[in-house]
Amino acid sequence: TKIRFYGGRESLLDKSQILLQADRGPGEELTEGISASLTASAMSSLSDSCAIVLSDYDKGVLTTEGALSLIKAAGDAGIPVIMDPKLTGLEKSRGADAVLFEIRGLGLLQRRLMASDQSEAAKNLIETYEWGAMLVLGGVHGVTLYQADGETMHLPCSAVAPIQQIGLHDAAATALAAALGNGHSMTDAATLAAAACECVLSAEASHEFVNRTTLGVWLDELAWQLQISDR
């Protein structure tokens, strides 16, 4: 069970905004038996799934063996896998179709790899771990897609007044799963993920959700931007 705390100071800001997030959970890892049971349960649900999202909190729920077995089984079944990995457990994501990163995380790996820029770091990581693509979430800096074939696409953030960013990973993972699971291309999936992230950035609070009309407006704006930039 994870307990989440939020803190902020409204006197310093024009609007209320989350400044601090602290998560508290059990310190001990789960037993291997529980992890194996959860993996087996996920494996049995593959036939009824159109996509798989694996999110690693490094608490023992997702082991390297379990993650790789799910990725292989999904690949054999033609089911796309979206992975939200820990930087210290990238081996668990080997072979995933799409991997989520924050811009700060990629910057850290860039320094570790001594790459000249984030593009080179992304290329190195994609080749090393055999990913299909990497989607980098930059918040107000937009979303960048790096693909195994070398193609790169950047989607700038068009949110007029970004308020918060709690939930970006969940929004992006859900959008990728919905798009890839319904047979859309990786670029289309990244576009939907960017729109979902902008909805989160513009939400009054992390519990606020948008309807289909609002999301459609974001997608129309992104489509127009891509059209005028010949992307």
Please provide the spans of the model-predicted regions.
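Conserved N-terminal subdomain of the carbohydrate kinase-like
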Residues: T1-V53, E208-D230
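Conserved phosphate-binding/catalytic region of the ribokinase-like
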Residues: E29, D48, E65-P80, P85-G95, ...
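Non-cysteine beta-strand/loop elements that form the S-adenosyl-L-methionine
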Residues: A96-R104
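Short, basic, glycine/proline-bearing loop/turn elements
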Residues: D23-P26, S55-Y57, R104-L109
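Short glycine-rich anion-binding loops that position phosphate/pyrophosphate groups of nucleotides
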Residues: Y57-G60, L87, G105-L106, V140-H141
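Structural motif
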Residues: Q21-D23, C50-L54, I82, L100, ...
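Conserved structural-core and active-site-/substrate-pathway-adjacent residues in large, well-folded domains
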Residues: I3, I52-S55, E102, D170, ...
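Long hydrophobic segments that form regular secondary structure
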Residues: A51-L54, G60-L62, A67
